[in-house]
């Protein structure tokens, strides 16, 4: 029992250390829902260390050293290593549908329904998750060096992690608020004690 608990503790500590090395883009290109689940999968031996294109070769080498594994080339199935890119919205084509807002893991897109949206270049991790939901195909990825005011490198991992946590908390809070509103509506429509 104690040995199992020690192994779980070591695995948890290793996952935290691995997560500390990951770039926190939360891009899901690794095949996991975010950097933390990927770190946990590496720590327990369920995932290889070469599935993170944003981290590239330098990350793979650091993960190999930390996890005691041999370095591997980046798995091309997960993407290719390249310069930092950011999302850019063609504001003339944006219809303000707001479908790009929820998938952005760090809330780097600002706007309101029925109004033009824009990407805050200094916050964009380059995850590309905003592209697919756009019904008018007005979002494209550009090298950060070609966008005025954009840094050449991705935001620091600790800031991405904090913004990702805040994004998740905001979504949970909104879901709870919507559930409470729905309960009040059902109660108002059906009265107390009457099944909906």
PLM regions with names:
Residues 14-25, 44-54, 73-96, 101-102, ...:
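Ferredoxin-like iron-sulfur electron-transfer modules
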